[in-house]
Amino acid sequence: KNPTAADRDVTMDDYLSLGVLTALDAINKVVPKRKVHGVGYCIGGTLLAIAAAAMAQQEDERLATVTMFAAQTDFSEPGELSVFISPAQLAMLEALMWKKGVLESRQMGGAFQMLRTYDLLWSPSVATYLKGERTGVNDLMSWNADGTRMAYRMHTDYLHQLYLNNDLAEGRYVALGE
């Protein structure tokens, strides 16, 4: 579900219980006692890793494997994204998200465009405006076009606890109350 203002207070635990764990419950109803090969992309991969760790603590063995693409579990070196992760930047972002209850997908896409300015801004601009060429679609443009909104509380907690404080890698992150 793509969140709306009504989902402002949806938490990371909600994403885990209503997303990952509910999906596993549904799968196990169709194919009982079968282990699932989980795949997560970007924040979905991080959520899957958190779910797998929480499940391991509860001796829940429904996951056979976990595969993550473009996902982080250690945020100590977030690369170019660190430009956007500081207490001041997060305060500004929180104020922006608070108004609508979500971070709009175009705002998230804009951050990624700023990280890949040559591929996503300059090269297409030069080709289109200066050379009069039509640029083809590339994988980065497709990925940015397939955006989702981020619920205020979930995204705020994600940025503070994982990016700013690195609570997951340092063993301080609490998932599903444990």
Regions found by a protein language model. Give the residues of each.
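Alpha/beta-hydrolase-fold enzymes
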Residues: K29, K33, L47, A51-H155
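Conserved catalytic-core motifs of eukaryotic protein kinase domains, centered on the activation segment
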Residues: D7-V10, G79
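Short, surface-exposed "cap/lid" segments of acyl-processing enzymes
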Residues: K1-A6
